[in-house]
């Protein structure tokens, strides 16, 4: 739900939920998020103004989050599009464990494809353990990648934000964000 709050799609979703509530007073509405901080506000926007008290279920799970920035000593000529940060692949590879499940997020499909090719080129031994995932891939191809991660046969996935919506991987050991995250909720 955190992806919908405060944007045009979220407003459209709220209007649709309002219409559904108007047509069926007994409808049950569920909202879920693994990262949302303002649960009461989200519940209010999902359920509407004149709703019953929501039932909020929270996990007591505590996760240790380590955030580390990889910034090159010399930026040189800064690439403003497409191949953002690709020159820092060696620094990135020092941080990624080949045996750990890792999601490598980029902000665009083009970046994900470039990083995927770069990581494959510099890690031929990972050929069968690295995959690409973005919304423009065939649905069956995306499903194969998701199943490979869940089974453990795929260790690294270079992906766009299409992978952070509605996909639950157990466990993901590392997450890498190349470039700035679209928002702090996505980063965490």
Segments and roles (model prediction):
Residues 1-188:
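Helicase motor core with emphasis on the C-terminal RecA-like subdomain
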């Amino acid at each position: 739900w955190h992806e919908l709050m405060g944007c045009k799609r979220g407003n459209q979703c709220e209007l649709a939920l309002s219409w559904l509530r108007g047509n069926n007073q007994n409808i049950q509405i569920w909202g879920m998020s693994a990262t949302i901080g303002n649960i009461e506000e989200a519940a209010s926007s999902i359920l509407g103004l004149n709703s019953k008290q929501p039932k909020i279920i929270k996990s007591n799970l505590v996760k240790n989050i380590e955030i580390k920035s990889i910034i090159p000593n010399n930026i040189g000529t800064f690439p403003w599009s497409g191949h953002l940060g690709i020159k820092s692949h060696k620094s990135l590879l020092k941080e990624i464990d080949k045996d750990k499940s890792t999601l490598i997020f980029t902000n665009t499909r083009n970046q994900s494809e470039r990083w995927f090719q770069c990581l494959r080129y510099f890690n031929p031994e990972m050929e069968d353990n690295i995959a690409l995932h973005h919304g423009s891939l065939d649905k069956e191809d995306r499903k194969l990648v998701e199943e490979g991660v869940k089974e453990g046969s795929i260790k690294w996935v270079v992906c766009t934000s299409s992978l952070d919506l509605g996909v639950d991987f157990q466990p993901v050991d590392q997450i890498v964000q190349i470039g700035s995250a679209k928002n702090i909720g996505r980063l965490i």
